[in-house]
Amino acid sequence: LKAFKRVCKKTPLRMLLRGQNLLGYTPYPDDVVEKFVTKAAEDGMDVFLIFDGLNDIRNCACAAKAALKAGKRVEGNIQFTSSPVHTVESFVQTAKDYVNIGATAVHLEDMGGMIDPTTAAKTVAAVKKAVNVPVHYHSHCTGGMTEITYWEVARAGADVLDVDVSAFALGTSHPAAESI
């Protein structure tokens, strides 16, 4: 990280942080989370994109607080999925919760590429209406609908779409930047 920051002096570095699980699948106590985030910030991390696999903000609050204390930016990452309890309203509430703990942007992440374009667009529009921060949309091409979903979420107001250059795109990756 220090080597990257020495070379990328003007480029903000962002990491994906699994809340209380940090970089793995084991939950850590608050003091370990605080020290990890503090050290990452000291070594050059600028933006902490924080999520919990169950969208439980309580598992993100400690990391967010530590990042803000270190003077760094926090972005909230909502795990977008489909189930009876994962509704537009639940995603809106999660977005509000992230903003309440200091997030300056909200990401909707469909890691499986399985959310249909209409549902994704309705969710983006509702989140945009509910929070006054940029809304990012992130998906993979696994399900075959991501390019049209990106079209619909862009029309619904998404501020940022995650893409890759064509050599690294499609399949289980993101859509190609050139086609979006």
Predicted stretch roles:
Residues 161-170:
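Short acidic/histidine-rich active-site segments
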Residues 169-180:
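C-terminal helical cap(s) of enzyme catalytic domains, especially alpha/beta-barrels
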Residues 1-13, 18, 22-137, 143-144, ...:
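Alpha/beta enzyme core
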